[in-house]
């Protein structure tokens, strides 16, 4: 409930430039508010660039598109399906980045849709986390936007302008991970690898789509076996992709046998994307802990070193645990033969989930 007011406030106060890329732009009051806020700043002389994924943002209304473009917003679509570029259809931009005046950046898991207008108070409100960033880390986030913008044919007139700023804006050390499609693990996947390998006490993962690459699954097993408290929180009954849930269950037995805790969030769709390692390190952004994010999609992640941020996110994680069903043993999965068969049938499709 705090996310959109902060984003809208930043947009409405913009003086020079707004850069915005998102995979999800659907419907609802926030979709209308955001479109009209962007349009108003464009009419006020602010350079506004909006990049929408051509697959993920399909449900967006033409009315809101017209509101923005008629006001001077430069709106582009990322990789529209084309018969002569069929290989691009499966490689989307899953990023969610808003940069305002080189001063503020927002990133995380939140899209622009009514599903994110609450905070899991009922099954229609998704549970998610988004972050506002200031300081030097704004620049690489904007550079990540620009990589997608240029892919979509956007111009690059003054894109290289970087304002002078202090090397540090606070007590948090941030590193931005710009991940693109690769045959092997991309940089988001390698960041997951590094954090898992570094963990010594706890590794708490939140992800809406849990279908890790085989190497990441093996690293989670190794972490649990060396005494790390490994927890994975995923959606429970309210998931927007049942296929993904079945595939996650296919791997759950191996993880549970190694001592990993599996938590299913019950109130609504769980869409948080984060890793909390020990008491200092966290990772958040658009990347899911699944094969698509580490092989196929354009993603952005932020790795932060900050004991206070770690503690805050750990507190949120523990609060969410109170609303989860917890599984410690493969026998608790209580799966029917049909579900087992479905999970195995989905094995060849793991890279699609």
Predicted feature descriptions by range:
Residues 1-353:
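Charged, low-complexity intrinsically disordered terminal segments
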């Amino acid at each position: 409930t705090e996310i959109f007011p902060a984003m809208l406030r930043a947009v409405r106060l913009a003086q020079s430039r707004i850069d915005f890329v998102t995979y999800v732009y659907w419907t609802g009051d926030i979709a209308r508010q955001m479109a009209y806020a962007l349009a108003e700043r464009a009419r006020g002389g602010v350079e506004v660039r909006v990049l929408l994924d051509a697959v993920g943002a399909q449900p967006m209304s033409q009315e809101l598109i017209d509101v923005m473009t008629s006001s001077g917003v430069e709106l582009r679509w990322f990789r529209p399906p084309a018969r002569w570029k069929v290989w691009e259809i499966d490689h989307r931009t899953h990023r969610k980045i808003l940069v305002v005046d080189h001063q503020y950046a927002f990133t995380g898991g939140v899209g622009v849709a009514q599903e994110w207008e609450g905070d899991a108070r009922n099954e229609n409100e998704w549970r998610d986390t988004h972050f506002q960033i200031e300081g030097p880390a704004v620049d690489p986030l904007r550079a990540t936007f620009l990589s997608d913008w240029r892919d979509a044919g956007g111009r690059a007139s003054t894109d290289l302008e970087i304002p002078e700023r202090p090397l540090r804006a606070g007590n948090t050390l941030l590193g931005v991970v710009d991940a693109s499609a690769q045959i092997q693990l991309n940089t988001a996947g390698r960041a997951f690898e590094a954090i898992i390998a570094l963990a010594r006490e706890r590794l708490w993962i939140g992800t809406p789509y849990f279908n890790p690459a085989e190497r990441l699954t093996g690293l989670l097993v190794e972490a649990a076996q060396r005494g790390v408290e490994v927890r994975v929180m995923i959606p429970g009954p309210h998931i927007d992709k049942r296929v993904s849930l079945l595939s996650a269950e296919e791997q759950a037995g191996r993880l549970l046998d190694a001592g990993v805790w599996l938590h299913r969030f019950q109130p609504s769709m769980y869409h948080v994307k984060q890793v909390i390692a020990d008491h200092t390190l966290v990772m958040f952004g658009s990347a899911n802990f699944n094969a698509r994010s580490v092989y196929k999609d354009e993603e952005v992640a932020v790795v932060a070193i900050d004991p206070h941020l770690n503690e805050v996110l750990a507190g949120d994680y523990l609060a969410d645990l109170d609303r989860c069903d917890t599984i410690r043993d493969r026998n608790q999965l209580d799966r029917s033969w049909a579900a087992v068969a479905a999970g195995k049938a989905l094995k060849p499709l793991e890279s699609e989930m």
